[in-house]
Amino acid sequence: MQNKIDYKNIKKIGLVTRPNVSLDKEILKLQSILSIYKVELVLLKESSEILDLPKYGLDDLFKISDFVISLGGDGTLISLCRKACEYDKAVLGIHAGHLGFLTDFKVDEAENFFQAFFQGEFRIEKPYLLSVFLEDKQGKILEKLAFNDVVISKNNQASMAHIEVFRKEKKFNEYFGDGLIVATPAGSTAYNLSANGPIVYTLAQAFILTPVCSHSLTQRPIVLPKGFEIEIMAKDCILCIDGQENYKMNDFKSIKVGLSDKNVALIHPKNRDYFQILKEKLHWGN
């Protein structure tokens, strides 16, 4: 994954907005800022119907851009990060709406950011994703990536989920309840946190198993290391990747999950403080 950005030779920056939201005013402001540095802003086709700016499909946008801006919330950034892995391109998150854990600043602050950026004043962080291997009943394997989490939940709200977890063909644990969350460190502040899972530092090489409303008082979240692959078996359950892709577990004979070797390069302001963000979002201290 991209370790360095040649900030002195940036020619094109791609931009993707959250769907079904008009952000033309914000896009024009970003274009105006980038034009100062002789950088062309190019858009995903769906990002604006009105603006007269170059527009491309997502694959072509990644191919021609030096890096890509996600303009929206954490959800927009999450889906973009999975695609960024395919093209070894970095992503910058600018939020439009509520401040998330992943997007750092609003468009109103972009002028200051890019002034520093084009002087080399920025940082790159590379959180790891989850690899998900879904093997169907014909033996065909579908590989997917998850930036935040993989959630196994009951298909029928009236029933209880029964989820078995194996490691090297030996049963590792068994869960009865509403479901199970497999979260990355970056995703530890999302659904995992709501289910009383631990917060894990974003760049840690680990992942988390957190039961959802377990019917046993002894079931607790556990943090597992990179290289620890689990197999998950559950009948009549749904597997959801990053809240965006759903699969019926009955359609697969094997589902394996572990921390991927793949990471995504996220561009941040140089003064970004992860723990200050936690303090502000979670109201720690004064």
From Swiss-Prot:
Residues annotated for NAD(+) binding in this entry: D74, G75, N148, D149, D178, A186, T189, A190, Y191, N192, L193, S194, Q244
GO BP annotations, alphabetical order: NAD metabolic process; NADP biosynthetic process
Family note: Belongs to the NAD kinase family.
Cofactor(s), names only, from the UniProt record: a divalent metal cation
Q: Which organism is it from?
A: Campylobacter jejuni (strain RM1221)
EC number from the UniProt entry: 2.7.1.23
In the UniProt entry, which residues are flagged as the active site? D74
Single GO MF descriptor: NAD+ kinase activity
Which UniProt keyword terms apply here? ATP-binding, Cytoplasm, Kinase, NAD, NADP, Nucleotide-binding, Transferase
| Protein name (record) | NAD kinase
Its primary localisation, in coarse terms, equals cytoplasm
